[in-house]
């Protein structure tokens, strides 16, 4: 195994190179202003570039050395001021990125987003009840616990509530694992339970049919990032993204997307996430996929189903800008630091006889 070469942006810009003995990381700065838990090249390169511009030390934790970085962090050899978590999976108990996020938080670092809040909101059955309590529009749902699976029987009242066919979703799980879109009976529920053995609850939901808006499916993936809401057209089958323009938002009366996303952010306490929301022929909005905390920022120029490039660039900017405010504050007052730099420069100029005249 060859050593790993790590490049650092920011103060004291230097290469932190691994030795060539196969022992992995051998030289690391004491502290990083910003650490990015793995993202695709386009997005991570943009974050790295911005860190260089803002004078922030930066490290990208790629999968090959995620576990080793956690060990260095736990041993006190590395410190992290801000972690942007784009990769952790709370549904996997041994996921190194989730361990990284929890370790950074435990050691006093700032994590975007809080791993404990993300894990708590990741339980769809519990989060569903929370959304209902706060009047956030979600499909009609019947929640079934795993302990009730053997005795569970769909009643006429339940079928009247969720309709046929209905959607089956595991309460705990990521991606589409265990999701059944054309459920007909208890057998589909048990099939979902077998596919996701670690989920303790399951949701039977009314299947929502989106309306068409001038040939476009009224299905949206909407991003929330520190109070800013960015809606996108998103096709649930092809995964194709297009930004919703201000004109389209006014023309199709899509303003409720912003209100719904801000309500979800308020309830969940999560800063950076996406949700799937659809609009029906009855002009009703429904949140379909409640909360995705590890947003995929793969760019459309590289991946057909990726997000628009301008969205990826903007998200990188907002995240780094927020991280800079936190990192500079933890270094010391930002204005005082700038003032000291100016004084140091003036003193050097005076000593060289080139000080500006007053």
Regions found by a protein language model. Give the residues of each.
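ATP-grasp fold ATP-binding core
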Residues: 131-132, 158-177, 199-214
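Conserved N-proximal alpha/beta basic substrate-recognition cap immediately N-terminal to
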Residues: 39-149
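A short glycine-rich, hydrophobically flanked beta-strand micro-motif that places a catalytic Asp/Glu
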Residues: 270-282
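Rossmann-like NAD(P)H-binding beta-loop-alpha module
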Residues: 141-163
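Phosphate-binding site of ATP-dependent enzymes
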Residues: 181-268
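C-terminal active-site "lid" helix and adjoining low-complexity regulatory extension at the edge
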Residues: 279-358
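Glycine-rich phosphate-binding loop of ATP-grasp-fold ATP-dependent ligases
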Residues: 141, 166-192
């Amino acid at each position: 195994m060859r050593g790993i070469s790590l490049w650092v942006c920011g103060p004291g810009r230097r290469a932190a190179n691994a030795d060539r003995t196969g022992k992995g990381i051998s030289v690391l700065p004491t502290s990083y202003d910003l650490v990015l838990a793995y993202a695709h090249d386009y997005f991570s390169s943009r974050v790295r570039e911005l860190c260089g511009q803002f004078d922030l030390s930066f490290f990208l934790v790629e999968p090959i050395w995620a576990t080793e970085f956690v060990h260095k962090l736990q041993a006190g050899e590395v410190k992290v001021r801000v972690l942007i978590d784009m990769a952790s999976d709370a549904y996997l108990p041994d996921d190194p990125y989730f361990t990284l996020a929890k370790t950074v938080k435990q050691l006093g670092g700032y994590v975007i987003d809080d791993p404990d809040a993300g894990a708590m909101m990741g339980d769809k059955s519990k989060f569903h009840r929370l959304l209902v309590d706060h009047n956030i529009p979600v499909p009609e749902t019947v929640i079934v616990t795993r302990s009730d699976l053997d005795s569970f029987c769909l009643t006429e009242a339940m079928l009247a509530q969720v309709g046929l066919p209905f959607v089956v979703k595991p309460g705990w799980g990521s991606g589409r694992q265990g999701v059944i879109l054309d459920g007909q009976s208890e057998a589909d529920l048990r099939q979902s339970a077998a596919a996701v053995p670690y989920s303790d609850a399951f949701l039977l939901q009314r299947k929502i049919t989106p309306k068409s808006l001038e040939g476009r499916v009224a299905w949206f993936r909407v991003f929330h990032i520190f109070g800013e809401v960015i809606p996108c057209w998103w096709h649930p089958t092809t995964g194709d993204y297009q930004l919703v323009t201000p004109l389209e938002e006014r023309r199709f009366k899509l303003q409720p997307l912003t209100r719904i996303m801000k309500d979800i952010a308020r309830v969940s306490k999560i800063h950076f996430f996406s949700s799937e929301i659809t609009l029906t022929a009855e002009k009703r909005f429904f949140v379909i996929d409640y909360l995705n905390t590890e947003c995929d920022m793969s760019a459309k120029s590289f991946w057909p189903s990726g997000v628009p490039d301008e969205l990826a660039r903007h998200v990188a900017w907002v995240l780094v800008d927020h991280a800079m405010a936190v990192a500079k504050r933890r270094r010391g007052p930002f204005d005082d630091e700038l003032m000291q730099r100016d004084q140091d420069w003036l003193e050097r100029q005076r000593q060289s006889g080139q000080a500006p005249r007053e």
